[in-house]
Design a protein with these regions (language model features):
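A glycine-rich, often tryptophan-bearing local segment used as a flexible ligand/cofactor-contacting loop or short
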Residues: 325-401
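Aromatic- and glycine-enriched glycan-recognition loops and surfaces
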Residues: 2-3, 47-51, 89-106, 273-281, ...
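A short helix->loop->beta-strand "cap" motif at the edges of active sites that frequently abuts
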Residues: 112-113, 161, 344-347, 438
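A short, well-structured beta->alpha microelement
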Residues: 117-126, 282-305
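Extracellular ligand-binding/catalytic regions of CAZymes and related secreted enzymes
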Residues: 28-31, 38, 212-246, 286, ...
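Hydrophobic targeting/anchoring helices
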Residues: 5, 15-22, 26-30, 79-81, ...
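Aromatic- and acidic-residue-enriched segments that line the glycan-binding/catalytic groove
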Residues: 22-78, 135, 267-268, 364-369
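Short acidic/histidine-rich motifs immediately flanking catalytic phosphotransfer sites
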Residues: 305-313
Length: 527
């Protein structure tokens, strides 16, 4: 703290101090050959020390055992269903980190400077979507933008004066070298993130790295100038209002709000063959016209009426992981709450192995609700006759090719009465089912693409009985999207591709007009 005060005194010209997420580095281990061995951007294992363990015992009233962190060698990564002791440790660390960080922020303010945090590598204890974060008193948060999901990681943060996104590419030699193409990377990054910005804008944009490297790429500088101008117009038109949301969607997993937009990430926007089919759901939602929230099973146990203002619940991931819940489905309160929600008219979308956990004669614990089950070998003795496909369904109406399910799922079969939309080699990849007054959709996987984003959009509308509102603030071409800012009296149409596009655009009153768009173009209109 003394060094911080000294720095402030010796640098009066500095008016913003940007902290690199304060104290604890995420879990990162290397092997004897200096290769990365283990990485977990959300890991807490690097925050353990004798002092911390002593303080934990005093506050919580029980000893912290090594196994609470080691966790059979899985180190409680975010795919593991968190136990009580690990969640206690996380909450303890958040309180401890918040107290220390507040001291630093208070000193910063006393010295007449703003305090900004770079949300990233030292994020332990400073997760912005928990209540402790607001007590720190930060003025701003900045973070790296890799895609729409990581943009929403930043823009959805509450309790700060402004948020900022650091866009790619970084001004490093791996991109800015002879023969490099920084413009291509910049375009991909901006167009990908723009979808999310149009739903929840950050307040500022920027880049990082060695500035002098960019001087040798004048075409890059010109493109960045165009991005800045586009962002200014976007921000001016969208600020101060929530864009039109057609439905309210909740992503249900073991983490809930604390992992908002970050679920299915091992590291920041890092591709994994095993999870891209699930991460695509979150990426699609980041720029879709829905009011999205993230809820946990603990939230349901605390308040089973939490779903009262929700239209559709999504449970996505592999069985027995934190993303689908694992053994939590043995708790009758959880399964009853979801069944009641759907039976009374709610929508449910299960992706991968939703509610997957072998228990009481089922692998998918909501198999009766979803109308689909996984063949684990225990039911091979039962014949299965429901394999007919129903391709002329509302959900598939805009598809132009066979649906890309990514890795898909093997050994999924449908119960009688379930309507199969897609099965391949007698393995169900997509199906719909009625349950009481409600509806469910099963999808084996859905990597992010514009066409798959449209499939998810229609799935949400169908499961929520929302077919009638399809042609409101809507583009018939799935490569083009419409966002309406009704309070501000404006709406925009955006081409997400690098090619010209034609589409029919529907306004909020279902009137329409034809439109031709240049690559990447965004057009603004008065309502």
């Amino acid at each position: 703290m003394e060094r911080l005060r000294k720095f402030c005194e010796e640098h009066p010209y500095v008016n913003v101090i940007r902290y690199t997420t304060f104290f604890h580095q995420f879990t990162l281990m290397f092997d004897e050959l200096k290769r990365e061995k283990y990485v977990d951007w959300y890991g807490y294992s690097a925050s353990v020390s004798p002092y911390i363990l002593e303080q934990f015992e005093k506050e919580m009233g029980y000893k912290f055992r090594p196994e609470y962190i080691i966790d059979q060698g899985y180190y409680n990564n975010q795919y593991r269903v968190p136990g009580k002791e690990y969640k206690d440790f996380q909450a303890f660390q958040r309180r401890e980190v918040a107290k220390l960080a507040k001291e630093m922020v208070d000193i910063t303010h006393e010295c007449g400077k703003e305090a900004m945090m770079f949300w990233g590598d030292h994020g332990i204890g400073t997760e912005p979507f928990r209540e402790e974060f607001a007590t720190i008193g930060l003025d701003a948060v900045v973070g790296s933008v890799g895609n729409g999901s990581t943009l929403r990681l930043i823009s959805d943060i509450e309790g700060v004066k402004y948020t900022e996104g650091r866009f790619l590419p970084y001004f490093f030699p791996d991109t800015f070298h002879e023969g490099g193409d920084p413009v291509k990377e910049a375009k991909e990054n901006w167009v990908t993130a723009r979808r999310a910005i149009l739903r929840k804008p950050i307040d500022r944009i920027g880049y990082g790295g060695y500035l002098k490297l960019a001087l040798d790429f004048p075409e890059f500088l010109d493109y960045v100038e165009s991005v800045c101008n586009e962002f200014r117009e976007l921000y001016e038109n969208a600020k101060g209002t929530t864009p039109y949301c057609v439905k309210k969607v909740a992503v249900l997993n073991s983490w809930g709000k604390i992992r908002s937009w970050g679920c299915h990430m091992v590291h920041h926007a890092l591709y994994q063959k095993q999870n891209y089919s699930y991460a695509g759901i979150i990426e699609a939602l980041s720029g879709a016209p829905f009011d999205v929230k993230f809820i946990s099973f603990d939230d349901i146990l605390k308040d089973k009426d939490i779903s009262k203002d929700i239209d559709v619940i999504i449970n996505v991931g592999d069985g027995d992981t934190a993303h689908t819940g694992g053994a939590v489905w043995e708790n009758a309160v959880i399964s009853a709450a979801i069944r009641e929600f759907v039976y009374q008219g709610g929508g449910f979308i299960g992706v991968g192995e939703p509610a997957g956990h072998q228990y009481q004669g089922h692998y998918l614990q909501l198999a009766d609700l979803i109308g689909v089950e996984k063949e684990t070998g225990f039911t091979l003795n039962y014949d299965k006759y429901n394999w007919e496909e129903h391709k002329n369904h509302f959900i598939l109406a805009d598809t132009t090719k066979p649906v890309d399910f990514g890795e898909g799922k093997k050994n999924m079969f449908a119960y009688e009465g379930t309507e199969i939309l897609v099965q391949r080699d007698k393995e169900v990849q997509m199906a719909v089912h009625e349950f009481g007054e409600g509806r469910s959709v099963y999808i084996s996987g859905l990597p992010y693409s514009f066409e798959n984003s449209r499939i998810l959009y229609r799935s949400i509308l169908w499961s929520a009985h929302g077919e009638a509102v399809l042609n409101q603030w809507f583009s018939t071409n799935f490569n083009v999207e419409v966002h309406a800012y009704v309070k501000n009296g404006k709406f925009c149409v955006v081409n997400n591709t690098y090619e010209p596009q034609k589409t029919t655009v529907y306004r909020g009153d279902k009137s329409s007009f034809e439109l031709e768009m240049a690559p990447n173009e965004i057009k603004w209109y008065m309502i």
